[in-house]
Amino acid sequence: MENGGRPSLCQFILLGTTSVVTAALYSVYRQKAWVSQELKGAKKVHLGEDLKSILSEAPGKCVPYAVIEGAVRSVKETLNSQFVENCKGVIQRLTLQEHKMVWNRTTHLWNDCSKIIHQRTNTVPFDLVPHEDGVDVAVRVLKPLDSVDLGLEAVYEKFHPSIQSFTDVIGHYISGERPKGIQETEEMLKVGATLTGVGELVLDNNSVRLQPPKQGMQYYLSSQDFDSLLQRQESSVRLWKVLALVFGFATCATLFFILRKQYLQRQERLRLKQMQEEFQEHEAQLLSRAKPEDRESLKSACVVCLSSFKSCVFLECGHVCSCTECYRALPEPKKCPICRQAITRVIPLYNS
């Protein structure tokens, strides 16, 4: 605390930082909780012969937020893996990721760093169909890349290490960056894979479509089943809730600490003011009872023992209130009896 009981700059920064972080974490928690609640309330629709009749009876021939599960089937053509034979899919993602070590000037350590230097995603139209044979129904999946959880499977991974000469190594140490290599990855959504779709289910011209939902709800095309997907979302909600509570507790603790310090400072000021008033009252009583010739000596008396003359000037407060013996008897750390400020230096006072 600074003088006067005001919070210090560090305390203001700490309180402001924890408050902002708490507000941000709480906002993320509320958003995650809302997403989880909407996902929990999504209507489960069976991919069967009665799907079109269910949608035709729904308001607007639409289920705003539905869960449907089926197998992936391409509409016409398929995508072939560039690295794996006889691997066909409807979504293909090729990624080149650079891995390197970067020198941290603060910690004086080499830190791992990775960066995507190239990524390409190819898609072809595909449907979700029942796992059972003989059921003539399909759901066309629209805008799959808008999904927040695209169930791609890594079918190929290879790391290409960097080949470095001695001069390259010296140059990397000087520049503070040491390349490790390039990781090449291919991910695919295979034909026949089981996919759980969560989105808007619409019947349009006798065809069923699954598309991104409206009203800010999230679109899912996950390789997990619905229960696992919901459990993962709820785990995420619990994590953000715990983080918000921890930082909220830190904010409350910081605020309590600041207010408590202010309260104690105020109580100390009131106590010192009361002591000063008592000293002045006691001194006034002594002066009123003393003989006229003794009043000057009483004005110069030590406020502690009232028997010796004041002989010390306390710095930095500048009070002249104590004799040398009483100053030496003050407990460590020595503080002025009047204002309770720390005594940094004592100047002897000589009475003529």
Swiss-Prot record:
| EC category name | transferase
InterPro entries for the chain: MDM2_MDM4_MUL1, MUL1-like, Znf_RING, Znf_RING/FYVE/PHD
Q: Which gene encodes it?
A: MUL1
Transmembrane residues, as ranges? Answer: 9-29, 239-259
Protein name listed in UniProt: Mitochondrial ubiquitin ligase activator of NFKB 1
Quote any Pfam family the record assigns: GIDE
SUPFAM superfamilies the UniProt entry points to: RING/U-box
> What does the UniProt entry say about where the protein is found?
Mitochondrion outer membrane; Peroxisome
What exactly does this protein do? Exhibits weak E3 ubiquitin-protein ligase activity. E3 ubiquitin ligases accept ubiquitin from an E2 ubiquitin-conjugating enzyme in the form of a thioester and then directly transfer the ubiquitin to targeted substrates. Can ubiquitinate AKT1 preferentially at 'Lys-284' involving 'Lys-48'-linked polyubiquitination and seems to be involved in regulation of Akt signaling by targeting phosphorylated Akt to proteasomal degradation.
What's a Gene Ontology MF term here?
A: p53 binding
Report the PTM annotation. Answer: Ubiquitinated by PRKN during mitophagy, leading to its degradation and enhancement of mitophagy. Deubiquitinated by USP30.
Q: Which reaction does it catalyse?
A: S-ubiquitinyl-[E2 ubiquitin-conjugating enzyme]-L-cysteine + [acceptor protein]-L-lysine = [E2 ubiquitin-conjugating enzyme]-L-cysteine + N(6)-ubiquitinyl-[acceptor protein]-L-lysine
**UniProt xrefs under CDD domains:** mRING-HC-C3HC5_MAPL
Cross-link Glycyl lysine isopeptide (Lys-Gly) (interchain with G-Cter in ubiquitin): located at? K52, K273, K299
Q: What is its main location?
A: mitochondrion
